[in-house]
Design a protein with these regions (language model features):
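Cell-envelope and extracellular/periplasmic
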Residues: 4-261
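Aromatic-residue-lined binding/catalytic grooves and analogous aromatic/hydrophobic interfacial grooves
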Residues: 263-302
């Protein structure tokens, strides 16, 4: 498969509700989106004028018609802000709230779905009862347009305590690489932590398992959720939490692509690159792209 445009970087995303997008989209999330940040609609969405398998400007929601803000939103925004102006970024998001990693097992997903509650079965129907195959089909279509550069995952809450989870995710990753004729060293796996213990995350113990992934998958990179604000259920992130987490996915990916993705706080202060309304705490600051410097600058207050 030969890509039509090597400067169109495509990222596959899958997982459960935090990748699907649980927070309400706020006004700021639908403005200032670059024409270089695109999403491939994973399903038909007539009310938004979207057709499955077609590219659109990445206005949220990026999963299905009525989902919310996702890490993909600010992953893509941050990427295009920091990549050369000739590079476009596209995301394909197939995520199902409440699912276990077993739902993406290409060999046994049918048996797994049979054991699940009706509400999950109804969501899975949107993906023809096989989200893995659905994602692969979309990815193959996308490969006619650009180059798959990475795979983003946020899943684990429904597998909390499952010590075999890293191996199960490894199987999904390796299947994707094989089915799409990709090389692991060219397509890293970026996996976000669930809501952190510092936010009283009810599944925070799963992060101990997630953090072992690089020992199982040499091309896996764990994205910290520390400090990312949680919603009242302590299971999902707030909109601000998704913005922060998405930017962290991008920071890691930019580094892997060879870009200096962050400069230190003192230099950021000296350069006076700030938002008009500074973050209340440094950890809340979001990246300000500077493609010419090849850097991602954070502005905020202590």
């Amino acid at each position: 498969m030969h890509a039509q445009d090597k400067d169109f970087h495509i990222y596959l995303a899958f997982g459960q509700s935090n990748m699907e997008g649980n927070a309400r989209v706020e006004p700021q999330d639908s403005i200032g989106i670059s024409e270089r940040f695109l999403m491939m609609s994973a399903v038909d969405c007539p009310e938004r004028g979207r057709v499955k398998g077609e590219w659109y400007k990445a206005l949220p929601p990026l999963s299905r018609c009525h989902t919310g803000l996702t890490p993909c939103d600010y992953f893509g925004r941050t990427m295009v802000d920091n990549l050369p102006s000739n590079v476009k970024v596209g995301v394909i998001n197939v995520a199902i709230g409440g699912c276990r990693i077993e739902l993406f097992d290409k060999e046994s997903c049918a048996e797994h779905i049979a054991t699940q509650p009706d509400w999950l079965k109804n969501i899975v129907k949107s993906y023809d009862n096989n989200p893995y195959a659905w994602l692969v089909d979309l990815a193959k279509k996308a490969q006619k347009d650009g180059v798959i550069k990475g795979i983003l995952v946020h899943q684990g809450e429904s597998n909390t305590g499952d010590k075999e989870w890293p191996e199960k995710l490894k199987g999904v990753y390796e299947n994707l690489l094989s089915d799409l004729n990709l090389k692991a060293e060219e397509v890293p796996l970026l996996v976000g932590e669930v809501v952190h213990a510092d936010q009283k995350g009810i599944c925070a113990s799963m992060n101990d398992i997630i953090d072992t992934l690089p020992q199982v998958i040499s091309t896996a990179h764990v994205i910290s959720s520390a400090g990312c604000p949680a919603a009242g259920d302590n299971l999902h992130f707030t909109a601000r939490g998704y913005r922060m987490l998405g930017a962290r996915y991008a920071e890691t990916m930019l580094q892997l692509l060879g870009y200096k993705a962050m400069i230190n706080k003192q230099e950021a202060t000296r350069m006076k690159l700030w938002y008009s309304a500074p973050a209340r705490r440094w950890v809340e600051a979001l990246p300000v792209g500077n493609s010419r410097l090849g850097a991602m600058v954070y502005g905020g207050t202590d």
